[in-house]
C-alpha cells in the first residue's frame, strides 16, 4: 500500500515518497523531464468530492488553480471520467482558464474528448443499446422491486443506477448487480460498478484504453494516474502495461473508506480530493 501525504497545505512541503520502487521511478521521471510527462486524473472522488447528488458535484475549490499551476510545466493533463466530457468541463470549471491550455477531458471513458485549445467536444455516434436501456430501466426497476431511494442518472452515452440514498446502500447495490448485468447484456452493454453506483454503458472503452491511447498519442516518457474508484483499476492496469514497455509510471490513490482496492495497488495514497490538490500544488512548486 502507498503511504499517505501529510496534512500540511504548504505547497513548498517536500513531495511524499512513493512506497514502491516503480512508483519512485515514476516520480523521478516526472521530475526529471516534466515536459514529457502526462498526468491523468479521474474527476469524481479525485478532483471533486463525492456527494449524494452527482449533479451537485464540483471540483475542489483549489483544484483548478493547482492544475493551472502544474499543467504548463508538463506535456499534458488529461481528466478521464465516465461523465460526459461537457459535464465534467462545466462541473470542473476548466473552460477558459489561463494555464489549462494543455488540458484535455476524455469523457465517457474516452468516447468523448474536449480540448481546452479548441473548447469543443468530439464524439462518435451513441450506442443504440443505451437508448433502449434508458427507456426500459424505470419499469424494470419497478418490476424487480428496487430498493426505496434507488435512482437513475442520465449520462448521455450511459445510464447509471445509484444506491447511495437507499436505506441500506450496500445491500441495494449488491441486490441490483445481477439483474442490471442481465439487462445490460440483453442490450449489448456492460455494467461498471462504482461507489454505490452501477453504470450501464457500451463495452470496448474504459479508462485504461483511454489513458493508454492518449499517452501513446502524446509520446509521453512518463505517466502519472490519480483515481479513487473501481472504474480506475483499468487505468492502473494501463500504467502497469506502460511500465512493462519501459515508460515509468506513478499510481496515486485518492483514498476513501468506501473503496480499498486502489489503495492496495497504489504507489502513493493521499487523503481524498484535498490530498490530490495538495499533491498537484506541491508538484507544481517542485517544478519551478
PLM features per residue range, with description:
Residues 41, 107, 227-228:
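Active-site flanking residues adjacent to catalytic metal/cofactor-binding acidic residues
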Residues 46, 85, 231:
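Conserved Rossmann-like nucleotide-cofactor binding loop
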Residues 58-154:
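Active-site phosphate-binding/coordination module
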Residues 96-112, 182, 262-277:
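Structural recognition of alpha->loop->beta junctions
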Amino acid at each position: 500500500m502507498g503511504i499517505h501525504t501529510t496534512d500540511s497545505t504548504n505547497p513548498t512541503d517536500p513531495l511524499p515518497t512513493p512506497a514502491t520502487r516503480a512508483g519512485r521511478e515514476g516520480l523521478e521521471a516526472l521530475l526529471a523531464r516534466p515536459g514529457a510527462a502526462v498526468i491523468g486524473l479521474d474527476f469524481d472522488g479525485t478532483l471533486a468530492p463525492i456527494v449524494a447528488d452527482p449533479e451537485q458535484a464540483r471540483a475542489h475549490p483549489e483544484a483548478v488553480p493547482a492544475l493551472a499551476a502544474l499543467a504548463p510545466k508538463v506535456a499534458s493533463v488529461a481528466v478521464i471520467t465516465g461523465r460526459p466530457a461537457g459535464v465534467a468541463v462545466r462541473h470542473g470549471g476548466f473552460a477558459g482558464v489561463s494555464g489549462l491550455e494543455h488540458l484535455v477531458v476524455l469523457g465517457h471513458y474516452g468516447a468523448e474528448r474536449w480540448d481546452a485549445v479548441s473548447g469543443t467536444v468530439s464524439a462518435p455516434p451513441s450506442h443504440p443499446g443505451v437508448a433502449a436501456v434508458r427507456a426500459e430501466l424505470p419499469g424494470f426497476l419497478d418490476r424487480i422491486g428496487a430498493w426505496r431511494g434507488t435512482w437513475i442518472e442520465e449520462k448521455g452515452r450511459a445510464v447509471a443506477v445509484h444506491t447511495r440514498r437507499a436505506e441500506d446502500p450496500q445491500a441495494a447495490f449488491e441486490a441490483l448487480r445481477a439483474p442490471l448485468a442481465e439487462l445490460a447484456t440483453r442490450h449489448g452493454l456492460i455494467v461498471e460498478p462504482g461507489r454505490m453506483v452501477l453504470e450501464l454503458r457500451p463495452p470496448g472503452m474504459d479508462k485504461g484504453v483511454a489513458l493508454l491511447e492518449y499517452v501513446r498519442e502524446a509520446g509521453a516518457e512518463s505517466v502519472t494516474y490519480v483515481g479513487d474508484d473501481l472504474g480506475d483499476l483499468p487505468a492502473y492496469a494501463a500504467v502497469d502495461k506502460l511500465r512493462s514497455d519501459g515508460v515509468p509510471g506513478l499510481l496515486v490513490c485518492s483514498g476513501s473508506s468506501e473503496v480499498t482496492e486502489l489503495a492496495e495497488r497504489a504507489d502513493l495514497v493521499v487523503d481524498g480530493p484535498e490530498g490530490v490538490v495538495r499533491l498537484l500544488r506541491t508538484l507544481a512548486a517542485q517544478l519551478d
